[in-house]
Regions:
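Domain-level recognition of nuclease-like catalytic cores that cleave nucleotide substrates
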Residues: 491, 497-521
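Active-site metal-binding core of divalent-cation-utilizing nuclease and nuclease-like domains
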Residues: 138-143, 436-462
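Structural motif
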Residues: 148, 464-466, 500
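Phosphate-binding site recognition
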Residues: 1-425, 440
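Mg2+/Mn2+-dependent nuclease catalytic core
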Residues: 169-173, 472-489
Length: 521
């Protein structure tokens, strides 16, 4: 195994621990310089979970605490000369999930207590907003420096109940009450930084704080969290080479695979490509390219959102929306798109400046396969989808160019779930095929679109390419004819591989595949 060059901070989100432990730190302090030069005072940042928000918040805390020694060699070291020590109040709300009103009030109490021990508690300060107000004022009076307030994951207490009006309202009132002093505390505040997954106006809990700079979709801040291609290919290049050596890949091949799995996030109109930092760090540390981010937990609010809007798995990607669609309250939402985007399951792939519309797609292979696996049981159960079942068997037979055996396996599978699929529409069968072929993409390259036409599925193997066309109550011969007439094979002639055309017909009365036709060019 090739020697790893950097120490990666897996699971570490505290800036001081990373710097003192000599872990790799991707320098983001130039963004703090930008805040200070522009005299920004109230900043809001929305990013998906596990995307580096907490680390950036911790970096800000260390900076405003004047911990100069931690920033040696970083961009801000050349900018900052004074290193003033400000009182910093850092509230982490990520632990306030699945709470009722009493539990949330208790959690806020625990967040406030350490600062009351430092700066005292005034008589008559009982409610969280009164206590926050008093802490900030006393911190300023006792230190002579304005306070800094950092609120990390501000929306965590609300996301799981975002579609439950009776539960959302009391929790939202508590959080509105907690944040309410911030505007009138302006004379005592040096800087305020708030992070979350949703945009603040969506949960309408900052109604009084109308001077927030929402930088979430600004081009210049697109890589404030996450890892850019430049950062990856400079600071992490030696470990990409080492990973490639372990996986019998060249540097270029390894970089391409990392890109396919973890890149592709765009947070603005002209955003540079951004890699998921959680998955990238896990992959380089574990020396294996695998799905990590989706496996770290699918939020319950996402599943509830998909269920509420009856989202079909085929309808998730390549959606077009207005910029205003990202900025609606939960009560007014008409689709799952805003939460899918802000949660990191979809990202911006195109922007039409004439129409001011965005096209959203899955950012990368990791997210797409993870999402499909999560939703597959709704369509494909009771058969499990692992290497030993349908997808694995199907791929093994295609790998051996045993197309006949692969089709026999697929027919048997569809027959096994025929009762589940009885009286369903053509679209339901298309969904089943869509899931099966896209789940193959977890192991092999699967393509749907070409410049010439759109085959139902194209599966690449080391020595062969398989082009599938599916018909519903038609004929396999008709499917083969469409492959020929539309020229679906043309893009693959130059590959020098064996080329197979497979026409498949599904019979709605039999509720399984009735016939198929295989032709090799």
């Amino acid at each position: 195994m090739a020697k790893i060059v950097n120490f990666y901070p897996v699971g570490i989100q505290t800036f001081s621990n990373i710097r003192e432990g000599k872990y790799l730190y991707i320098d983001k302090t130039q963004y703090i310089v930008d805040f200070r030069e522009k005299k920004m005072k109230y900043v809001f940042l929305s990013r998906p979970r596990r995307f580096g928000k907490s680390l950036f918040a911790s970096t800000l805390q260390a900076y405003f605490e004047g911990r100069k020694e931690l920033f040696e060699g970083l961009a801000i070291a050349d900018y900052e000369k004074e290193w003033v020590k400000h009182p910093v109040l850092h509230f982490d709300l990520s632990g306030a999930k699945h709470f009722d009103a009493d539990a949330l009030n208790s959690y806020l109490n625990l967040q406030l207590l350490p600062y009351e021990k430092l700066y005292g508690k005034g008589e008559g300060e009982f409610y969280p907003n009164e206590r926050l107000d008093g802490i900030v004022k006393r911190a300023y009076e006792q230190t002579g420096e304005k306070a800094v307030v950092i609120i990390d994951e501000y929306d965590a207490p609300l996301l799981d109940v975002v579609h439950e009006k009776e539960n959302l309202q009391p929790l939202r009132r508590i959080m509105q009450n907690f944040y309410s002093p911030l505007k009138k505390l302006d004379p005592y505040l040096e800087f305020t930084f708030i992070t979350g997954i949703t945009k603040f106006s969506q949960l309408s809990i900052f109604s009084e704080l109308n001077n927030l700079d929402n930088i979430s979709m600004f081009d210049q801040y697109s890589a404030i969290c996450g890892i850019s291609k430049k950062e990856l290919t400079t600071q992490m290049k030696p470990d990409i080479e080492a990973l490639g050596e372990d996986l019998d890949m060249t540097y270029e091949e390894c970089l391409a695979e990392l890109t396919r799995f973890y890149d592709g996030y765009h947070f603005s109109e002209k955003s540079e490509d951004v890699f998921n930092p959680f998955s990238l760090v896990k992959a380089l540390n574990a020396r294996e390219i695998a799905p990590y981010w989706f496996g770290s937990g699918t939020p319950s609010y996402l599943i509830k959102t998909l269920q509420k809007y009856h989202v079909n798995v085929m309808d998730i990607e390549k959606k077009s929306c207005d910029v205003d669609d990202f900025d609606v309250s939960p009560e007014m939402m008409t689709s799952a798109l805003p939460l899918l985007y802000q949660s990191g399951y979809l990202t911006i792939k195109k922007y039409n400046p004439m129409l001011h519309r965005y096209t959203l797609e899955y950012p990368n292979r990791e997210v797409k396969i993870g999402m499909l696996k999560s939703l597959a049981p709704n369509y494909l159960s009771p058969i499990s989808l692992d290497n030993n079942s349908l997808v694995g068997d199907f791929l093994e037979k295609l790998y051996d160019a045993d197309v006949e055996g692969a089709m026999v396996r697929l027919k048997a599978y569809l027959a096994s779930i025929s009762n589940r699929l009885s009286n369903k529409s053509e679209r339901d069968f298309q969904t089943v095929f869509y899931l099966i072929f896209n789940l193959m993409g977890a192991y092999m390259r699967v393509e749907e679109d070409s410049a010439i036409g759109r085959a139902d599925a194209v599966v690449y193997m080391p020595d062969a390419v398989f082009v599938f066309e599916l018909k519903y109550d038609g004929s396999a011969e008709e499917a083969i004819r469409q492959i020929d007439e539309k020229g679906y094979l043309i893009p693959y002639f130059a590959d020098g591989k064996r080329l197979f055309k497979i026409g498949v017909n599904y019979d709605s009365n039999l509720r399984t595949i009735s016939d198929w036709k295989i032709k090799e060019e």
